[in-house]
Amino acid sequence: AEEPRSDGPGRPSPPGPDDMAALIYTSGTTGNPKGVMLSHRNLVTNAQAVQQIFDVEPADKLLSVLPLAHTYECTIGFLVPLLSGASVTYLDGPPTPSRLLPVLERVRPTIMLSVPLIIEKIYRARVVPKLAKLPGFLRKFPPTRTLFHRLAAGKLKKTFGGRLRVFGIGGAPLGPDAERFLRDGKFPYTIG
C-alpha cells in the first residue's frame, strides 16, 4: 500500500482525482466476483454520466435493497441521490417479503434498483400462478394476456407504494417473460 500524501505533520493531503476511492465488486456474472479499484475520478465521472440520462430530483425517495459494494447500487443508488439531494432508505437485510413489504408501505419509493432475480421471483410467485388459471386460449391470446399483465402490474405498483416512477434493473439479463410482463403492464422499469 502507498503512504498517504501529507500537507505537513499529522495532516494528510486531500485525495487526488486518480487516488483510489472505493473497492467495488463485480457481480460475478461470468465467473467469481472480483474487486475493482475505482478512483475518485471514476466515481464522479460515472455519477455525472448517470445524471445526464437518469433524472433524480431532491423530492425523490430511493429504497436500496442491493449491496453498496456493487457498482450499480453504489453509483445509481448512493452517489447520484447524494449529488441530487434525494433521500435513500436502506433495507437492513436481504429483501425478503417480510422485511421488504412494510418498508415499501412506509417509504413509498419513487426510485428503486434491483437485480433481475427479484422481479423474476415476484413474477413467478404472484403473476404466473394466476395467469395459469386462465383457460389456455385466453392465456395465449395477446390482448387478454396484455390486459391481465396491466391489471397485475397495477397491483404491483401499489405494493411498491404507488409512487414508483423508475424501477431500475441491472447486473444480469432479465428473462423475456418477466420483461414482457413489465412492458405489457406499463410498469415504470428501465434496464441498465
Residues of each region from the PLM?
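Conserved pre-ATP/AMP-binding loop-to-beta segment of ANL
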Residues: 6-25, 32, 55-61
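Conserved S/T- and glycine-rich ATP-binding loop of Class I adenylate-forming
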Residues: 20, 26-29, 62, 67, ...
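Conserved AMP-binding/adenylate-forming
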Residues: 112, 148-192
